[in-house]
Amino acid sequence: MSKRNLRSLISGLAISLIFSTSLFGTASAEDRQLRKIFSGWMTDYSTYGDTTKGQIQAMDYVVAHSEMFGQILPFWYTLTSATTIKDKYATQNSIDKSIPIATLQSLGIKVIPTITDGTAEGVLSKIMGSDANRTTLVKTISDLVTANNYDGIDLDFEGFAFVDKIATWPTIQPRWVKFIQELAATLHANNKLLSVTTPYLLDPTTGKKGYYFYAWPEISNYIDRLNIMAYDYHKFDTAAGPIGPISWFEPSLIYALKSVAPWKIYIGTPNYGYNWVTKVTGVCPTNTPTSEKKSSNAAIIHQLKAQAILDKPGAVATYNEKYGETNVLYSAEFNGVNKTGATTSCKVDHSAWYVDARGYGARAKLVEKYRLGGISEWEIGYGDNLAIEEVKKVAIAMGQDKVVGEVSSSVDNLLYGESAAFNGTFKLADGRPVSGVPVYMDIKRSSGTTRRAIGSTATDGTFQTRVLLGETTDISFSTDETWDRTLGQTPSKSIGVSRVISWKIPASMKHGVTYKVTGQVQPRIAGVNVVLDDGAKVGSGTTLADGTFEIVFTPSKIGAKQFRIVTDGEINFSSSKSAFVSVLVR
């Protein structure tokens, strides 16, 4: 190809690209919404910790970073029987739990508290194995969710794995699956979410199964969240090593993806680590802290205060890419006397492992790679700002196009049995229409909230529908969240519905004579207060079960009068007013 032809081709491609970009548009950074991929457990003792005593206030941390949180898992409850759930929050806090719940939900954060298993060995399995007791347990949990207006519940039943005997696992599995199916049905019927938190499982084709009885493939269609506990590979009572190395838990994550929808999966991420004593050289003096003995368990360290380890004299920190964790090595020397008073000294070698900001970023990139729901932090409030900022970088890169919904209604008030027409649009923030997507009508009444499909948007992003209303209703319209788009939601429209009034009154009356005004309201119901009105109240009555009413009154003034019937406003109905009727009072 000649240079002249090559220049012409490049020029043509450039013009074509400019044209196509201006024609179809692209979403700017301002038109995209940060993806809420951060989650975690907030314990009862740290929700409102006493900062004067050095305690953590997890709520402060969540509020400060609220744009990152799609959900919070308050670690507040322990199951003790099929009918009893212990409230740990109530024993730790003077602030009523309705305060943090309302605060979080006002920030658009779903509140899905965790229930742990506080029963003895084998007890929970037996409960789930009994049809009657399992039904009772489902009701106990669903009642807790409803009573506190939670968005769902998270089950962290680790007793199966770490208390019950391995020989019982084959029996536990079908009982667990049956329980999950029944609890999910109850929660979903009330628009509540079911989350489960479990240790790792492995693909059985590899010859390893992990804690297989949690049965991810069997429960995948029933749960809404799966938190994988990707930590405690090494613990305080083991040899030194990484807490939750990526190379260890990623195979479990890949196995989960074979049966569980990616957006349901959250990587359990520790913001803690351990500081082990790995070697003691010499004989330590009597004033050496107990924690410096080789026989002692490792001391826990939190990401928030890890700098104290890094500041140790001679400390060398190394970030391990494979593990996604940082290892800090240092030595401490102690001089003094032994039990006999003789001079002595020792050198204590330490090895500390923890997940720092880089480790959080690495796990967030796994969320991006596999299109997961996010990461779940244990425990909220003990992480530093650098870590969540690393996650935020990925959350921004994974941002969704913002969907903006608008809707108008043909009326704001109507009579019982009449319908209202709605016309609306869904567009991206930059004005591009959201076409061909299902639209749902969200109906909120005093009796509850329902959601039903009404069709799809047209090519220009518009939708129309007409609704027959039987009571006062708040209506909004929505589109589902997708990987690329946010949830679309129109403002709510409140449509008042008034009862239909039919009534009779004589066209001519004599003053001083008593008359009966009769009528009926629709829908028919007893107990509706009905008033005869001529500009002021002149008589009243109450409807019977068939909606009929009777008002007795005696006109006292001569002349042409205007009368109407008025009903009181109710929870489900607006006040009704009939048309005025002219009556000649002689």
Each model region followed by its residue ranges:
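Enriched for extracellular/lumenal, surface-exposed ectodomains of secreted and cell-surface proteins
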Residues: 469-491, 561-579
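Short strand-edge motifs at loop-to-beta-strand transitions and within beta-strands
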Residues: 461-465, 547-551
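Substrate-binding surface in catalytic domains of secreted glycosidases
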Residues: 84-95, 161-309
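Glycan-recognition patch characteristic of GH18 chitinases/ENGases
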Residues: 30-141
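Glycan-binding loop/region signatures in secreted carbohydrate-active enzymes
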Residues: 271-363, 395-398
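Conserved, mostly hydrophobic/aromatic
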Residues: 72, 155, 226, 267, ...
